[in-house]
């Protein structure tokens, strides 16, 4: 039983996209990454509109014969500060999530473990680790390593008695 390709697959194949030959699991993974980014972008747009509206509603526009050099007496600085902190936090969180999800979508990362692997490979981690393993070890490091291996093997210094104590 062969599944007939969808209209989307036909379009991808027609324009020679690599995604046309990708597995369904890979497509779902990329779709999830895209939806996370688009969702955070939508939240960013919503919070920026909310911040804009709250700024415009607090704007002081004096009437014709009022001076514009003094703010009105019925002004609550505490609530204004609370709204400013709240909208600033919302904007910072939504923009940060958009940047994080966008970066993860670009470098094809879905969780923290994959992020660690990707960063290690991008920074040459495996090659540098092999180079460090080939270097000779100094005396202090060798002594420390042997001591730790003895402790892990269950060999302790107080188990061995010296000839002077006998």
From Swiss-Prot:
The chain crosses the membrane at residues 35-52, 81-103. It is found in: Membrane. GO terms for cellular component: membrane; mitochondrion. It comes from the Eukaryota. Keywords: Membrane, Transmembrane, Transmembrane helix. It is a multi-pass membrane protein. Belongs to the AIM11 family. This is Altered inheritance of mitochondria protein 11. The gene is AIM11.
